[in-house]
């Protein structure tokens, strides 16, 4: 199977910078802003966006992670134990503008699961969505507010995001 590099390290850096600016513009600054990255690569992207926002505004935005394991609808988990542990952040997200961050937006099911996790225990003012890659093929009425790159794909193709923090390289590849 052939693979195509869609984004290299420099393209990812530029995209993260642009997305940070878009999030700041959307929120009119950093007030009440919280970033939540969906494990695993979304959490690394959230930290990168947090760093960019800090460089731009000289303010550290509260940033955490969402583990959607117990909220997925495509696997059966014995004795589903839904706890607040799905969200890890050192800040209250009630009455905040929460931006969910993920690497690839595809069917929308991961985002639905993250919404379930957030809304189970909190009530944000507003929830937005940022995705490094939007590949289409939605199964749910979900769209990203901030998109790094729209990449039309077939359902047979895979979009792979590699980030230094996990994969020792930065690239977005289609195979």
Curated annotation (Swiss-Prot):
- PANTHER family documented for this protein: BIFUNCTIONAL PROTEIN PYRR (PTHR11608:SF0)
What is catalysed by this protein? Answer: UMP + diphosphate = 5-phospho-alpha-D-ribose 1-diphosphate + uracil
Annotated substrate binding sites: 40-41, 102-110, 135, 159
Its domain of life? Bacteria
By sequence similarity, the record places it as follows: Belongs to the purine/pyrimidine phosphoribosyltransferase family. PyrR subfamily.
Catalytic activity, EC: 2.4.2.9
Q: An example of a Gene Ontology BP annotation on this entry? A: DNA-templated transcription termination
Oligomeric state and interaction partners are given as: Homodimer and homohexamer; in equilibrium.
Q: Which CDD domains match?
A: PRTases_typeI
> Which InterPro entries does the UniProt record give?
PRibTrfase_dom, PRTase-like, PyrR, PyrR_bifunctional
Tell me the gene name: pyrR
What name does UniProt use for this protein?
Answer: Bifunctional protein PyrR
Q: Cite the entry's keywords alphabetically.
A: Glycosyltransferase, RNA-binding, Transcription, Transcription regulation, Transcription termination, Transferase
Function (record text): Regulates transcriptional attenuation of the pyrimidine nucleotide (pyr) operon by binding in a uridine-dependent manner to specific sites on pyr mRNA. This disrupts an antiterminator hairpin in the RNA and favors formation of a downstream transcription terminator, leading to a reduced expression of downstream genes.
Q: Where is this motif: PRPP-binding?
A: 98-110
Cite the GO molecular-function annotations of the record: RNA binding; uracil phosphoribosyltransferase activity
């Amino acid at each position: 199977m052939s693979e195509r590099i869609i984004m290299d390290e420099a393209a990812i850096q530029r995209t993260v910078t642009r997305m940070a600016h878009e999030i700041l513009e959307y929120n009119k600054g950093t007030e009440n802003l919280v970033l939540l990255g969906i494990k695993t690569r979304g959490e690394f992207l959230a930290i990168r966006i947090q760093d960019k926002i800090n460089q731009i505004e000289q303010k550290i935005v509260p940033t955490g992670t969402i583990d959607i394991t117990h909220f997925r609808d495509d696997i059966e988990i014995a004795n589903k134990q839904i706890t607040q542990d799905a969200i890890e952040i050192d800040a209250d997200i009630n009455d905040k503008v929460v931006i969910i961050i993920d690497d690839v937006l595809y069917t929308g099911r991961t985002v639905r699961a993250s919404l379930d996790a957030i809304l189970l225990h909190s009530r944000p003012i507003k929830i937005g969505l940022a995705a490094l890659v939007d590949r289409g093929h939605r199964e749910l009425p979900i769209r990203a507010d901030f998109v790094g790159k729209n990449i039309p794909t077939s359902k047979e193709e895979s979009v792979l995001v590699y980030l230094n923090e996990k994969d020792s390289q930065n690239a977005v590849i289609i195979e």
